[in-house]
C-alpha cells in the first residue's frame, strides 16, 4: 500500500478488510489474481478492482496512490523494496499457494526436470517452503 494509506502503520491486515478498498491485481485469468480472489472472496463484490500487466506495474501504481495490492511473498524481498510503498502481512492463517513441476510421462528429457527440481530445492529464501 502507499506509505500515506491509513493502514500504513498497522502490523497486519485481515484479508476481509480489502473488500472496501481499491485493489490492484494482475489481469483477470492470471493464476495469482485468481488465488487472491479465492483468498479474499468479498473483494470483487464491494471494492473496486483495477488490473495491471505485471507485478512491477502494479507496484508502481500503488506508489502513485492508485490503490493497494496483494503481492506474493517472493515479490516483497529486499531487492523489490520501494520507499513509496509499505508491505504489511495478512493476519494468520496467511493465505498460501502450492506450485509444482508437472510433465508428461513420455517426456524424454527427465534430466532437465531433475535439474530444475534441484535448482528449486537449492533456493535459500524464507519466501518458499518446500513440501
Question: Locations of the language-model features?
Answer:
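Flexible hinge/capping segments at coil-to-helix
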Residues: 1-23
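Thr-Gly-centered strand-to-loop micro-motif
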Residues: 2, 26-27, 71-72
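Alpha-helix/helix-capping structural signal
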Residues: 5, 30-31, 56, 74-75
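Secondary-structure junction motif
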Residues: 7-8, 21-43, 109-113, 117, ...
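Beta-alpha-beta core module
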Residues: 10-11, 17, 57-106
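Alpha-helix boundary recognition
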Residues: 16-20, 41, 62-63, 80, ...
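Short beta-strand-to-loop elements that line the ligand-binding cleft
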Residues: 25-26, 45-54
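A local structural motif
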Residues: 40-49, 84
